[in-house]
C-alpha cells in the first residue's frame, strides 16, 4: 500500500553546478502519489540534471531529498531503485541482441524463482498496466515505442513506484504517444507518482495534473494544468510573450520529385513490411506518414534511403529508379537526400565522436 499522507518526493534547496555553469539553483519541488507532474522547460533549463540527481546519476551540491517523508541520500541509481525510483532515459539502456524478457530480468538481485515463474510475474505486471510486448522478440527488431515499453517494464519489475520519463515522446508517433499516455494514466490510477520531462505544450496539457516550469536552472512557477494554457506556459518557459502562429508560405510551380510505385518489402523475419505502396512527393511539400508501431513506416523510409532492399516496385527520384542502390551510390548520383532514423543515437550518430565529425 502506497503512503498517501506524505509526498512521494520532496526536493528542497537543490543546487548543482558543473564548474562555473549552474544547472540547478535552490530548486524546491514535490509530487504526490497518484499524480502526474510535467517538468517543462527549454533545452538547457536544468530539467534532466534535476531528475538525474533524483535517480542517483548526479549528486546535489546543496539541498535535501525526501522520499515518503524521510530524508534520503541517493548516491547511485541502485540506491534510487531500492527507494522505488525508476528513470526511463531519453536514450534507452537496452542490450540490442537480448530479448525483451532478458532485458527486463538482466541485473535483478534477490531471490530468483526460475525463468518460468519470473516470466509469469512479468506477464501479470503487463496485464496490470496494459503494457503489450512480445517478450521473446529481440530488441534490435523492435520499434522505438516497443523499446520504451521494455524500459518501463524494467523499472516496474524492480518495484519502482515513482517513475521519471525523460522526453518520452521525442521519437514516438502520435499513435504511440497516445498509447503511452493510456499506460501512464493507468499507472496513475494504480497510485504511482509520475514525472515527465518535456517541452511539448500540447502533451503537457493532455497528460499532467501540475506543471513545474524551469528556466535557467530555477523553478519559475508551478501551476495546475486545468488552470493554464499554451500561451501562459510558453511565456513562463521562455520569459517573454511569443506568437504560436505558423505562417506557411505558398509554393508555386511544384513538380513531382519522388514517386513510389507498387513498392513491396519483406522484413528480416520473412513478413511483409510493405505491400504495393504508391504515392508522389512534390517540391515544396511536406508529406506526413502515419500509423501505429510496426505498420511499415521504418521499412518505407529505409527502403527509400537505400538501407533496405525492395521485393518489387520502384522509387523514382526525378524519374530515375534508385531501388537497389546503396546510400553511397545515391549520393554519387548527385541526389540530395537526408535520412534521420527513429533511433537517432543508435543508428544516426556515433556517440564517441563530436558534432563536427558526425
Language-model features: locations:
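Glycine-rich phosphate-binding loops of nucleotide-dependent enzymes
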Residues: 2-358
